């Protein structure tokens, strides 16, 4: 994979995005841009797939559909359509391909009605197919009648046409299957750039790559190949994809509450070459309507919304996810509701890692009861990792990573890592560099103690701290100041005062020579 090609594609796609920026918010022009990129990708992919299927028939996809209809032609068309639906999950007739829309633009036609039909035809082609859930409503956020695209129909048509023409000039590399990672990388880059400009909204759909890397590395330790990976608040799916890639996972599962972000996650899966039959992303509220029943997973990763509200309804006292902990998570801080949900879906030999605000480590009342249950009764807490502040878009609060395992032994300790001071400041953000990530992961893997960085606490030690997991209780990062020699300081002050007096006399002499003072 060429880094130069990667950067070129990133720059080209971001330039296209800026054509749409105008008066739109970052999130608005993100969905249009990523949707159009995805449409071009699907078009090029199906054209390649259909052409490959027709090699022995010595006819191209477009040529076949342009032929005069007869029984043999229609039969061959149906074979191609069925083959596409079974293998890549969707079908686009040649006159609805991205390239056909471009031809209409070059003829100076109004392409919005055709484009709208094209996107609808992609979704409709999957009805009744195994891929229906993966494609249904996928383009619902692309509103071509939106006033954000322009005041008049002509304005809208001109803007969208210019964006599509710019995309047409970019080589996605779909013809070369090994280049799929380059396009996937560029798509991830686009999402990260949009997140940087989305402020607080960024947390709804994006986990910084550095944090994703740590979570993914941790949950894959000890697993040559994961059977599956799950994220209950999957956002755009970036964290899921990272964990699946590092762990060579066969299947990917996720749930996302926001319908728009849910669409983004499904696009992200498909654009990274994940076959429709190998992932299942559901739209819904994870806590209120768990889409995965009693399914358990080899690895669970998540960056749940920090201290979000949930109903904490009485019915959850009888919900197997929460009932054994003794108390429900507070209505105004659902952090432990997400944690208990994730643990419920973790299999006995798996690892779970999630991001949370530091409050989960020490808050009392119901959360204190749940925390004690997880440590004393279950012995599930494997590690606590403190991260630097200001590494997430839209919030500057310090965060931590919590690692859980169900297969811990009675005498296992809990590893505390304080990585809060190891980062590089880049403009207004703090960044974790490869060496910082490596130190965190290596320290966790080797479970080693490093002075002022990590500590292995026994369960007895944690109990003596009343099950408070606040990192400073276990990792002493205090730097002693060198003792001050008062006598030496006083001597230095006297010497400086004497020098100042000498300089004052010297200056006074110069001023007298110049006649400026008597």
Tell where the protein language model's regions lie, with residue ranges:
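Non-catalytic, mostly N-terminal accessory regions of nucleic-acid modification and defense proteins
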Residues: 1-214, 218-219, 277-286, 291, ...
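Short, flexible segments with low predicted structural confidence
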Residues: 3-5, 157-158, 183, 187, ...
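A conserved structural/catalytic subdomain of Rossmann-like adenosyl-cofactor enzymes
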Residues: 4, 290, 294-518
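A generic secondary-structure signal for well-formed alpha-helical elements
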Residues: 40-53, 194, 223, 247, ...
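Short small-residue beta-strand/loop micro-motif enriched in glycine and branched aliphatics
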Residues: 195-198, 250-251, 424-425
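Conserved S-adenosyl-L-methionine
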Residues: 201-302, 307-316, 322-325, 336-337, ...
């Amino acid at each position: 994979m060429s880094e130069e090609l990667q950067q070129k594609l990133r720059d080209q796609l971001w330039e296209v995005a800026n054509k749409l920026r105008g008066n739109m918010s970052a999130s608005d022009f993100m969905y249009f841009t990523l949707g159009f990129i995805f449409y071009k990708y699907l078009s090029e992919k199906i054209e390649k797939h259909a052409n490959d299927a027709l090699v022995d028939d010595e006819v191209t996809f477009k040529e076949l559909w342009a032929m005069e209809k007869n029984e043999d032609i229609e039969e061959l068309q149906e074979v191609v359509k069925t083959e596409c639906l079974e293998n890549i999950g969707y079908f686009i007739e040649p006159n609805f391909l991205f390239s056909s829309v471009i031809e209409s633009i070059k003829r100076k036609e109004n392409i919005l009605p055709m484009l709208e039909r094209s996107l609808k035809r992609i979704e409709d082609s999957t009805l009744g197919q195994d891929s229906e859930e993966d494609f249904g409503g996928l383009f619902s956020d692309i509103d071509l009648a939106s006033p954000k695209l322009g005041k008049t129909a002509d304005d809208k048509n001109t803007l969208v046409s210019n964006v599509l023409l710019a995309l047409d000039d970019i080589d996605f590399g779909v013809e070369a299957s090994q280049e799929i990672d380059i396009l996937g990388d560029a798509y991830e880059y686009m999402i990260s750039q949009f997140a940087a400009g989305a402020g607080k909204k960024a947390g709804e759909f994006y986990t910084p790559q550095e944090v994703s890397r740590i979570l993914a590395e941790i949950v894959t330790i000890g697993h040559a190949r994961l059977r599956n990976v799950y994220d209950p608040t999957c956002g755009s799916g970036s964290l899921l994809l990272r964990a699946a890639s590092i762990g060579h996972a066969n299947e990917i599962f996720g749930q996302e509450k926001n319908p728009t972000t849910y669409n983004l996650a499904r696009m992200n899966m498909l654009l990274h070459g994940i076959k429709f039959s190998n992932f299942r992303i559901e739209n819904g509220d994870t806590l209120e309507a768990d889409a995965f029943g009693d399914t358990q997973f080899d690895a669970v990763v998540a960056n749940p919304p920090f201290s979000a509200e949930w109903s904490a309804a009485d019915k959850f006292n009888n919900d197997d996810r929460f009932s054994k902990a003794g108390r429900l998570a507070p209505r105004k801080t659902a952090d432990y509701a997400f944690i208990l949900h994730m643990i419920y879906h973790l299999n006995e030999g798996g690892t779970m890692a999630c991001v949370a605000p530091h409050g989960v480590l020490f808050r009392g009342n119901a959360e204190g009861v749940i925390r004690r249950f997880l440590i004393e009764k279950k012995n599930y807490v494997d590690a606590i990792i403190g991260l630097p502040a200001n590494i997430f878009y839209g919030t500057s609060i310090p965060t931590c990573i919590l690692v859980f395992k169900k297969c811990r032994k009675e005498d296992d300790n809990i590893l505390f890592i304080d990585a809060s001071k190891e980062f590089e400041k880049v403009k207004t953000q703090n960044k974790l560099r490869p060496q910082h990530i490596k130190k965190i992961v290596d320290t966790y893997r080797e479970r080693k103690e490093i002075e002022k960085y990590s500590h292995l606490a026994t369960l007895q030690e944690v109990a003596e701290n009343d099950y408070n997991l606040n990192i400073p209780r276990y990792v002493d990062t205090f730097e002693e100041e060198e003792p001050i020699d008062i006598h030496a300081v006083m001597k230095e002050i006297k010497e400086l005062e004497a020098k100042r007096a000498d300089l004052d006399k010297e200056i006074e002499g110069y001023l007298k020579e110049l006649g400026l003072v008597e």
